[in-house]
């Protein structure tokens, strides 16, 4: 127990609920939606990406040397253009930004029916002043990093899945549940969890459509293409590679970096694209690139979901287990009564 409890790897940490991580580029679809809803960008407006962004004395580079050229909103998601989001972040008011993101579940608990959930961090001016009293101002330079899911942003995998589900539902939020059915061990009576809409975020259909086209582009020609090649269903997704520590002008080489300092790998997904019925997040702590570590996991989950025989088998196993548990509990009650 002592070894488990003191391990640097924290094997007892419930990461989906209590692991707070920078979301990396999986945050960009939500930034794109915010840019449209707050009037910072239209889907048609394009920027010229030279491969870097300058602001005052600050310099932020794009992941692609030389840049992506002319980039509109849909392309910015499909090719994961950092420079596009540096600019959006620099132009946004941070408190309006946080106000927009909060209903997606960022910076607050989702309310799932399990204890121990953490709220993560959705930065505001007030948060910065309280967290860093010696440097209370939230600088525009801070915002630039936030725009690509780095910096002070930290969200749980559950929050990312929740936000993705809200996006898939075009703004309708359902409280997440782990418990599908509650069964009385003595009577055998059961009650199914009936998810119901909690609230609805007013979003313009055209704005959501543009983001979904960007997510489709990730799968068709972007970083999700290899993982979802020849899939029997349509899907949209976004990879994310979140830095654990910053590099100043150096080249990232995983083989030369301690494992617990390597980048985190993310992939958010929804399918089928026309009318999503599933939304998920795959996260690999210190896994490296999202396209290589997380996206293939998402593909396996999606395949199992859409393969009726696999899904039915999994559901049957769950039913059999619950019946076995109920039978064992009833037997225990009988023994105690005797």
Question: PLM ranges: what are they?
Answer:
Residues 1-26, 30-281, 323-338:
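Beta-lactam-recognizing serine transpeptidase/beta-lactamase-like catalytic domain environment
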Residues 20, 287-288:
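Short strand->helix junction
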Residues 85-87, 289-292:
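Extracytoplasmic/secreted cell-surface and envelope-processing proteins
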Residues 160, 175, 290-295, 299-303:
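Short, charged, low-complexity patches
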Residues 168, 219, 299-310:
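Short amphipathic alpha-helical signal-transduction/dimerization elements
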Residues 266-268, 281-285, 297, 301:
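C-terminal soluble interaction/assembly domains
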Residues 288-289, 307:
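Short beta-strands and strand-coil junctions in structured, solvent-facing domains, enriched
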Residues 308-329:
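Intrinsically disordered, low-complexity mixed-charge segments
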């Amino acid at each position: 127990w002592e070894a488990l409890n003191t391990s640097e790897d924290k094997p007892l940490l419930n990461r989906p609920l209590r692991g707070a991580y920078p979301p990396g580029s999986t945050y960009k679809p939500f930034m794109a939606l915010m840019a449209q809803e707050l009037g910072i960008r239209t889907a048609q407006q394009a920027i010229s990406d030279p491969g870097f962004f300058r602001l005052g004395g600050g310099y932020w580079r794009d992941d692609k040397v030389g840049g992506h050229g002319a980039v509109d909103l849909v392309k910015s998601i499909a090719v994961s253009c950092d420079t596009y989001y540096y600019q959006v972040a620099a132009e946004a008011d941070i408190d309006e930004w946080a106000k927009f993101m909060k209903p997606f579940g960022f910076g607050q608990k989702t309310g799932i029916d399990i204890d121990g959930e953490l709220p993560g961090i959705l930065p505001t001016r007030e948060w910065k002043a309280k967290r860093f009293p010696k440097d209370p101002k939230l600088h525009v330079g801070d915002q630039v990093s936030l725009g690509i899911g780095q910096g002070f942003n930290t969200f749980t995998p559950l929050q990312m899945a929740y936000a993705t589900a809200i996006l898939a539902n075009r703004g309708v939020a359902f409280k997440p549940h782990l418990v599908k059915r509650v069964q009385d061990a003595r009577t055998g009576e059961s009650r199914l969890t009936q998810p119901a809409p909690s609230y609805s975020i007013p979003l313009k259909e055209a704005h959501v459509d543009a983001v979904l086209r960007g997510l489709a582009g990730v799968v068709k020609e972007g970083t999700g293409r290899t993982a979802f090649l020849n899939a029997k269903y349509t899907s949209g997704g976004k990879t994310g590679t979140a830095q654990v520590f910053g590099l100043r002008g150096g080249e990232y080489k995983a083989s030369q970096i301690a494992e617990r300092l390597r980048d985190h790998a993310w992939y958010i997904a929804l399918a089928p694209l026309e009318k999503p019925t599933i939304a998920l997040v795959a996260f690999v702590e210190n896994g490296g690139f999202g396209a290589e570590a997380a996206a293939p996991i998402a593909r396996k989950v999606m395949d199992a979901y859409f393969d009726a025989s696999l899904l039915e088998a999994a559901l049957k196993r769950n039913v059999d287990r619950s019946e076995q548990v109920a039978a064992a509990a009833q037997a225990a009650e009988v023994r105690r009564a005797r």
